[in-house]
Each structure stands twice: as C-alpha cells, then as structure tokens.
C-alpha cells in the first residue's frame, strides 16, 4: 500500500465504498509504525499545510506555529483516541487489539483530514472540516464491527462514545494551541 496509487485507491475506497474498504483494511498486516508512516503522517499534514496558506495574512511565524502545533496535536490525538478505542472495545462486545484500533481510528479520519485542504479558506474552512468529520464518524461506525468485532447493535453506542472522546480530545488540543499563543485572542491581535 505504500505507493502513491495505493494511497489514492485507499482514499477512494474509504470515501466511496467504506464497507468494502474496512474488510480489506482488516485483512492487511500492519504495525503502528506502518499505519503512521504510510497514512497518518501523510494525511494529517494536509490541513496544517493548508493552514499555512489560509492564515498567512496573520503573519508567517504565527501560521507556521499554528500549522506545526496542529500537526503534532493531530498525530497525538490519533494515537490517544486509538488507545481509548482499544480499551473501550470489550465493553461493547469487541476485542482488544491496538493495531486494529489504530487502523479504525486512522482510516476513519480520512474524510476530515482531506477536508483540511479547506483551511486555505481561513476560518471558513473549519465548517467544511466539520461536515467532513460527520462523514468520518459514519465511516468509523461502519468499520467498528469489522475491526473491533463488536456486534452491530453495539456499534452505535460505541461510535457515539468514541466521537465524544474525540471531540473532548479536540477541545483539549485546541486549548493546548490556545495556551501556546495560537488562540482566538492572538488571532484578533494579529488581524488588527
């Protein structure tokens, strides 16, 4: 899968035929490193790179800090959310397997990470990313029974709890960025 065409095919599969894509993903051998280097580190960079363009008018130094901070936080949140998915799985009839949890988490983020290109639009891009995130949650829901082996009736509550955890992690990540001088007050000062 490490080829560029492999990535494009995988993206198309997750976005257009997620049920089939999850079956293929579940069957593939993978490691934490292979998932990060072959998927997460590539796709998670799209939004931060677009941020450099979309927020450049607020100052290059500020937009670089925001982009780098956002990228690091995306990498960390993906890992932490995968740990949460792994720990929660048995409570919903699933089984523990960190690599499967990371596959589910990382590949579910695909739509949201791709929508990160909308960050070139500045603040408006966030709305597009939000809409793509809703689709990402749906792909997680479809993948949960396949990768976590949870029963279909427990996939909805499992997905809802994971989504809430993901939102909480996103808020914490935003607070970290804000604490690092990249919050709304900094933006307002930069725009004046």
How should these model regions be labeled?
Residues 47, 56-60, 122, 136, ...:
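Short, intrinsically disordered/low-complexity patches at protein termini
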Residues 2-96:
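Selected alpha-helical membrane-embedding segments in polytopic membrane proteins
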Residues 7-10, 14, 160, 164, ...:
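Short, hydrophobic-biased amphipathic alpha-helical segments
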Residues 61-87, 99, 103-166, 173:
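Selective recognition of hydrophobic, aromatic-rich stretches within alpha-helical transmembrane segments
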Residues 169-192:
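Juxtamembrane boundary at the C-terminal end of a transmembrane helix
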Residues 35, 62, 124-130, 179-186:
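Short alpha-helical linear motifs
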């Amino acid at each position: 899968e490490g080829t560029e065409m492999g990535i494009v095919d995988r993206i198309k599969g997750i976005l257009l035929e997620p049920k089939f894509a999850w079956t293929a993903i579940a069957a593939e051998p993978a490691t934490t490193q292979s998932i990060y280097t072959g998927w997460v580190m590539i796709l998670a960079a799209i939004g931060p790179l677009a941020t450099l363009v979309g927020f450049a008018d607020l100052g290059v130094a500020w937009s670089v800090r925001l982009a780098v901070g956002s990228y690091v936080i995306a990498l960390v949140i993906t890992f932490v959310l995968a740990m949460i998915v792994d720990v929660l799985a048995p409570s919903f009839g699933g089984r523990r397997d960190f690599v499967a949890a990371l596959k589910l988490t990382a590949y579910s983020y695909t739509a949201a990470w791709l929508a990160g290109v909308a960050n070139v639009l500045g603040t408006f891009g966030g709305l597009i990313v939000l809409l793509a995130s809703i689709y990402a949650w749906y792909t997680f829901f479809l993948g949960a029974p396949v990768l976590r082996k949870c029963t279909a009736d427990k996939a909805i509550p499992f997905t809802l709890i994971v989504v809430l955890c993901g939102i909480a992690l996103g808020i914490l990540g935003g607070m970290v960025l804000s604490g690092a001088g990249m919050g709304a007050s900094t933006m307002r000062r930069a725009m004046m």
